[in-house]
């Protein structure tokens, strides 16, 4: 799963064959962004802001078994009161986390550029700067 606001600058982080369920993340001493707390390589908590954590970068891989579970669990979560206000990744990481063992896969700060604003897009692609 890839978020639409990402520019991949290191194509090696994208793998053709991938057999674990994991999120790409950047090891951080401190972040104000969405991040993971990880124990023994497995994500145990997702939150906004943290110390000694892994900053989420918006790319995840899902093995076949977890992909099927995720399809059912997303539907179930979204049908519950308040479910439509949830982010999809909260389903396997928060609301149904007992169903999953989601690992973290390290990437580097310069592997991905996240484009959050029109100003950031214009800085990367001058054709938008009109």
Label each PLM-derived region with a short phrase.
Residues 8-82:
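Conserved core of the sugar-phosphate nucleotidyltransferase
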């Amino acid at each position: 799963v890839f978020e639409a606001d990402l520019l991949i600058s290191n194509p090696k982080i994208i793998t053709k064959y991938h057999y674990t369920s994991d999120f790409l993340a950047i090891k951080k001493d401190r972040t104000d962004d969405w991040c993971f707390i990880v124990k023994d390589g497995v994500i145990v908590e997702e939150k906004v802001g943290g110390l000694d954590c892994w900053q989420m970068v918006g790319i995840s891989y899902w093995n076949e078994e977890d992909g099927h579970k995720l399809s059912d669990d997303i539907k179930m979560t979204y049908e519950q009161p308040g479910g439509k206000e949830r982010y999809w990744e909260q389903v396997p990481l928060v609301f149904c986390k007992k169903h999953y063992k989601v690992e973290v896969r390290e990437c580097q700060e310069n592997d991905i550029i996240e484009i959050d604003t029109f100003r950031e897009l214009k800085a990367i692609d001058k054709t938008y700067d009109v």
